[in-house]
Amino acid sequence: MLPMITEFINYGQQTIRAARYIGQGFMITLSHANRLPVTIQYPYEKLITSERFRGRIHFEFDKCIACEVCVRVCPIDLPVVDWKLETDIRKKRLLNYSIDFGICIFCGNCVEYCPTNCLSMTEEYELSTYDRHELNYNQIALGRLPMSVIDDYTIRTISNLPQINNE
């Protein structure tokens, strides 16, 4: 009879412990019930990107001196810089510049270390395509300025996310 009583007490303790764990989870669920949703309806609503957002790279062909600093600081040696040495003026002349955004990790080193500031990060992040070869942007595609999210009147912009109170 004694083993039966100890098993019953053990069973009661396990039941109380399980009910406590379920109650803790339920209290966490209830604490999240009065918060505002964090998600947005993406194609119809867009967040305004922060000032230091690292989106697609913008390139200004006329400012580039073909120094290849961007290639040296890139962790994956991504930018392709084709240049020709002009012997009469002893300077490099840029022929072609391209970046493959299918490989780019958007670290921003090329923008940060460019001595002539011919590279800059834009707020454009919608780069998805069905063909990965379309992600290889040459100097013409890199030179196009993106349409600002703020200027698009068909999309509702959300300036900031709801603040989470940790009280």
From Swiss-Prot:
Show the catalytic activity.
a plastoquinone + NADH + (n+1) H(+)(in) = a plastoquinol + NAD(+) + n H(+)(out); a plastoquinone + NADPH + (n+1) H(+)(in) = a plastoquinol + NADP(+) + n H(+)(out)
**Which topology term describes how it sits in the membrane?**
Peripheral membrane protein
Q: What does the record give as EC number? A: 7.1.1.-
Instruction: From the UniProt record, give one GO term of the biological process aspect.
Output: photosynthesis, light reaction
**Record's GO cellular component terms:** chloroplast thylakoid membrane
InterPro entries in the record, alphabetically? Answer: 4Fe4S_Fe-S-bd, 4Fe4S_Fe_S_CS, NADH_quinone_OxRdtase_chainI, NDHI
Cite the binding residues for [4Fe-4S] cluster 1.
Answer: 64, 67, 70, 114
Q: Summarize where [4Fe-4S] cluster 2 binds, as residue positions.
A: 74, 104, 107, 110
> Needs which cofactor?
[4Fe-4S] cluster
Alphabetical list of PROSITE patterns matching this protein: 4FE4S_FER_1, 4FE4S_FER_2
The UniProt keywords, alphabetically, are:
4Fe-4S, Chloroplast, Iron, Iron-sulfur, Membrane, Metal-binding, NAD, NADP, Plastid, Plastoquinone, Quinone, Repeat, Thylakoid, Translocase
Domain of life, per UniProt, equals: Eukaryota
Compartment(s) where it occurs, according to its Swiss-Prot or TrEMBL record? Plastid, Chloroplast thylakoid membrane
Q: Tell me where the transmembrane regions lie.
A: none
**What residue stretches are annotated with the 4Fe-4S ferredoxin-type domain?**
55-84, 95-124
Task: Report the co-factor binding details.
Answer: Binds 2 [4Fe-4S] clusters per subunit.
Top-level EC class, please?
Answer: translocase
Annotated GO MF terms: 4 iron, 4 sulfur cluster binding; iron ion binding; NADH dehydrogenase (ubiquinone) activity; quinone binding
What does the UniProt function comment say about this protein? Answer: NDH shuttles electrons from NAD(P)H:plastoquinone, via FMN and iron-sulfur (Fe-S) centers, to quinones in the photosynthetic chain and possibly in a chloroplast respiratory chain. The immediate electron acceptor for the enzyme in this species is believed to be plastoquinone. Couples the redox reaction to proton translocation, and thus conserves the redox energy in a proton gradient.
Relate the assembly described in the record. Answer: NDH is composed of at least 16 different subunits, 5 of which are encoded in the nucleus.
What the record says about family reads: Belongs to the complex I 23 kDa subunit family.
Question: Which protein, by its recorded name, is this?
Answer: NAD(P)H-quinone oxidoreductase subunit I, chloroplastic
Gene this protein is translated from = ndhI
